[in-house]
UniProtKB/Swiss-Prot annotation:
Pathway in which the depicted protein is active: Cofactor biosynthesis; coenzyme A biosynthesis; CoA from (R)-pantothenate: step 4/5
Any one GO CC term of the record: cytoplasm
UniProt enzyme class: transferase
Binding partners and assembly: Homohexamer.
Protein's UniProt name: Phosphopantetheine adenylyltransferase
Positions that bind ATP: T11, F12, H19, G90, I91, R92, E100, W125, S126, Y127, M128, S129, S130, S131
Species, as recorded: Wigglesworthia glossinidia brevipalpis
Native organism taxonomy: Bacteria, Pseudomonadati, Pseudomonadota, Gammaproteobacteria, Enterobacterales
Record-linked HAMAP family: PPAT_bact (MF_00151)
Alphabetized Pfam families for the sequence: CTP_transf_like
Length: 168
């Protein structure tokens, strides 16, 4: 499967060590992995698009075959315009599979030439979700195991700014 480009889309809000694990595994399979950072109108976002792109670039700075792009478009439109025919998705559990199965059928309708490659999450990350991470943040829990250091630093800055704002 080498000599191929693939896209790995997501909101990455926040970027987790589970995402990093999938990125590391993807670059072993594909020559180039384009990480697409998107907005999700259904989710309350902790970080804006630019911040999320910065986190990914910083956390993956030592990987040569990665490109990080932010989009406000359908992933299938981006893939078609750039002649990319492989989409990577992580599957943590049976619920993810159900959602990804439906999304794959929609993507196939929108861009029939694109194939979805599902990567099963390592057991260490199979339970992790952005909702769980946001709850840990809200209650001040330890994030060291779950998030890259650059993301933790920015979360602490955001919390500090919010506390200062609330004091004024």
């Amino acid at each position: 499967m080498k000599n191929k480009k693939a896209i790995f889309p997501g909101t990455f809000d926040p970027l987790t060590n589970g995402h990093i694990n999938l990125i590391e595994r993807s670059i072993k399979v594909f020559d180039k992995v384009i990480i697409i950072v998107a907005n999700n109108f259904k989710k309350n976002q902790l970080f804006n698009l630019k911040e999320r792109m910065h986190h990914i670039k910083k956390a993956t700075k030592n990987y040569k075959n990665i490109k990080v792009i932010g989009i406000n478009d359908l992933t299938t439109n981006f893939a078609r315009k750039n002649n990319i025919k492989i989409l990577i998705r992580g599957i943590r559990n049976i619920f993810d599979f159900e959602n990804e199965f439906i999304m794959e059928k929609t993507n196939k309708y929108l861009y029939p030439e694109m194939e979805s490659i599902f990567m099963i999450s390592d057991i260490n990350w199979s339970y992790m979700s952005s909702s769980m991470i946001k709850e840990i943040i809200f209650y001040g829990g330890n994030l060291d195991y779950f998030l890259p250091e650059c993301v933790i630093k920015d979360i602490k800055k955001k919390i500090k700014r919010k506390i200062v704002r609330n004091l004024n």
